[in-house]
Amino acid sequence: THITGANVNDCDAIPDVLKEIESRLGSLPLFMGLDAGYHNAPVAHQLRSRNIQPVLGHRRHTHAHDTLSKHRFRYNPELNCYTCPEGCLLEHKTTDRDGYRHYCSDARTCKDCPGREKCFAEKSVRKVVTRHVWQDDLEQADAFTKTPAGKNLYSWRKQTIERSFADAKQLHGLRYARMLGLANMREQAFLTAAVQNMKKIASLLWQSLSCLWISFFSTPACPCLP
């Protein structure tokens, strides 16, 4: 259980989570399943750089319904440019501080384009498509998640992590912060996890004792006994 402040994005906590896993277990996992909230290029790059295969939930990206989405444009890795549905090139112009490359079309070409109204907003003069510098890592993670092995690994996430987290929130009060400070919240989270583990231990003991009880009374009596 990794506790952070409410003003810290979950994606920013990935390096600390990996360090904590490695310090506790002595090694890092080969695969890591994450929900759609972690579906971005920096997270995929961080995991792959540590030899961890990301298994990410799909995020349906939003865009204006009256304009063409980014996925309608074809990327050419050799020329480092995009091609629009009409065949025009969008060349790389700049890279912002967040690591996104901006590919822009020629305003003079877009002015007379027949698909201009469906391509971008009326107030704009050209189409701009962004691509992260680590987009290749995200595309590799998406491709693996769609494979049978990736689907199988991701299905285990909802049976284990999501189920445990839902029980902690619904049944054990982890939905609300009952203490102040990160140290106190870690204490609440660890106590909640301890309670869940004790419930699992009690359930397993009851199942094993029930099996022994049934097998004992279902065994036929020895005929040599009086």
Regions found by a protein language model. Give the residues of each.
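Anion-binding and metal-coordination hotspots
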Residues: 1-226
